[in-house]
Regions:
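Membrane-interface junctions at transmembrane-helix termini in multi-pass inner-membrane proteins
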Residues: 10, 137-163, 186, 353-385, ...
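Membrane-proximal transmembrane or re-entrant/amphipathic helices at the cytosolic face
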Residues: 432-433, 456-512
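Helix-loop junctions and terminal segments of transmembrane helices
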Residues: 32, 61-77, 148, 152-153, ...
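N-terminal membrane topogenesis motif
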Residues: 1-28, 81-89, 124-126, 203, ...
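Interfacial segments at transmembrane-helix termini and the short loops linking adjacent helices
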Residues: 112-133, 325-357, 430
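Interhelical loop/hinge segments that connect adjacent transmembrane helices in multipass membrane
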Residues: 1-9, 186-187, 203-247, 289, ...
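Transmembrane helical elements of multi-pass membrane transporters/channels
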Residues: 11-31, 191-203, 207, 222-292, ...
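Interfacial/gating helices of multi-pass transporter permease domains
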Residues: 33-55, 86, 189-190, 224-231, ...
């Protein structure tokens, strides 16, 4: 990895971490205010509408991801004409997508009540609220959304993150004040499209300032169109699997169990997403750099980097999983003021931790799938995960409720995400045996389980309640697993390579 790629990754990581901190803390405050000022049914509605709109966003078909992938090469060789043509193409596509989302969203209006089992607040017009959420989604496509793709391909995700940090901070603060002072959910929701407009206008301004030579004009060649079409078909199924995994669960719980259960599930999922978001932030900051590396360096070099990055990330994943196991229930108990009716069982909590480990273990591998453009080759895997998750979630959810929904998600991730996608990556890009990669993962899993059992047992002996107990358990979670990991890995080749890489990043060596 060249010095420029390290520099870009470090810059993107710094801004992304700031954004992630904002995305964790401020929404938590807003979420808490909704629960305490309005009630769990309002939080359930928020989760349901958000999930529905994420499903509608499948209309994107993955054009942005496909175009960003195609942009890597012309950007690397300085072909601005092709870059401008691709941006112009994406601009036209986004306008069409916005129209389609609006049309489908309006068609769904009469069916909203069938997605809610039981009651919802009498004073709420669910159709009006839904239309506000829908307008927010449509605006995000119509107003300069294509400029975000340009900044990402240019390895300047730090710019979009800085804008998002400012806009989201402002929005969450305004929403919190509105909820605290007025307790009005309509006023809270109306700020979503308002701040989306401001965000997209700022992205346009910054993009024009940093890359004035890139304007949407020209036409792409037929060969590029064919390549985009091929990639989009694969990316769409990838998006389908991700959306089904992240949103179908909420819709299934709402339709089979009710809004209160959605609120409880989403409280745990919010914590899950916050920690997963941190892990995703770290890996996503490397995406453009990995894509550039795949475009300019050999397969063997990239394979060695995959093994090295997987080791580093597995250590991080293990730490996060152990922290979740030990701190999930104590934190929710403090958050919900000891109300056990708003808490999941310990078994479901452990399922959430398992869910976190299996999905986060795929993060580094996903960088190489995206960077090598294997979306088309993985179309069947994506489709099977999506279809499997939908079917299993409804079947197991019907019989076992939230437990069944979580089990369905874990099963489909292991079968069609971890195992299936690994096989395709090694067969189509690395073209070598996957044995070494799986041996590493088995070792990392075994060490994580031992670590987790030991740390959880020690934490269970701490009977101090409240924030003091949380802090003590957090210190235990940060010390014992790291010490055991260091003991196990210190003399291994993986540790030495990882340490050398981390050291080179911080002292800005030219090569790793």
């Amino acid at each position: 990895m060249s010095d420029s790629r390290i520099k870009n990754s470090k810059r993107n990581l710094k801004s992304a971490i700031i954004l992630q901190i904002i995305n964790i803390i401020l929404p938590f405050v807003v979420r808490t205010l909704i629960l305490y000022k309005l009630g769990e049914e309002y939080q359930g509605l928020n989760g349901l509408f958000t999930s529905i709109l994420q499903v509608l966003n499948l209309t994107d078909l993955g054009f942005s991801s496909a175009v960003v992938y195609i942009l890597y090469k012309p950007i690397a060789i300085g072909d601005n004409d092709t870059v401008c043509a691709l941006i112009s193409y994406l601009k036209r596509v986004y306008r069409i997508i916005g129209i389609v989302i609006l049309a489908i969203g309006l068609i769904l209006l009469p069916f909203l009540k069938f997605l809610i089992k039981g009651s919802y607040p009498d004073e709420v017009n669910i159709y009006l609220l839904y239309l506000i959420y829908l307008s927010n989604s449509v605006i995000s496509y119509w107003l300069f959304a294509y400029k975000t793709a340009l900044l990402l391909a240019m390895q300047r995700a730090d710019l979009t993150d800085k804008i998002s940090s400012i806009i989201k901070s402002s929005m969450f603060i305004v929403q919190a004040v509105v909820l605290f002072v007025f307790g009005n959910y309509y006023v809270y929701v109306i700020f979503l499209p308002i701040f989306s407009i401001i965000n997209n206008l700022l992205v346009q301004f910054v993009s024009k300032k940093y890359f004035p030579q890139i304007t949407p004009h020209g036409k792409i060649s037929e060969n590029i169109k064919k390549e985009i079409t091929k990639q989009v078909k694969g990316v769409f199924f990838n998006k389908l699997s991700n959306v089904c995994r992240n949103t179908i669960d909420t819709i299934v719980i709402s339709s089979l169990v009710g809004l209160t259960s959605v609120a409880i599930y989403n409280n745990y999922f919010y914590i899950f997403t916050a920690i997963y978001g941190v892990s995703l932030t770290v890996s996503n900051c490397m995406q453009a750099s990995v894509g550039n590396s795949i475009a300019t360096e050999g397969v063997e070099r990239n394979y060695k980097n995959l093994i090295k990055f997987t080791f580093i990330f597995s250590w991080f994943t293990s730490m996060c999983t152990i922290c979740l196991c030990c701190l999930y229930q104590p934190f929710v108990k403090v958050w919900m003021s000891g109300n056990k009716n708003l808490m999941l069982s310990d078994f479901n909590m452990f399922l959430f931790c398992t869910y976190f480990y299996v999905i986060t273990s795929c993060n580094i591998r996903n960088l190489y799938i995206s960077g090598s453009g294997l979306f088309w080759e993985l179309r069947l895997s994506y489709f099977m995960e999506a279809a499997g998750n939908i079917i299993l979630s409804f079947v197991l959810g019907y019989y076992f409720g939230v437990t069944g929904v979580l089990l369905a998600t874990i099963i489909t991730i292991v079968l069609f995400n971890f195992l299936s996608r690994n096989r395709v990556l090694f067969k189509s890009y690395f073209q070598r045996t996957i044995k070494e990669y799986y041996i590493d993962h088995v070792l990392y899993l075994f060490v994580t389980i031992v670590n987790c059992i030991l740390t959880y047992t020690i934490c269970s002996l701490i009977h101090i309640e409240g924030m003091a107990g949380l802090i003590i358990k957090l210190l235990i979670c940060l010390s014992i697993p790291n010490a055991l990991n260091l003991l196990v890995y210190f003399k291994t080749k993986r540790f030495k390579e990882a340490f050398k890489f981390i050291k080179s990043v911080f002292i800005r060596k030219n090569k790793i």
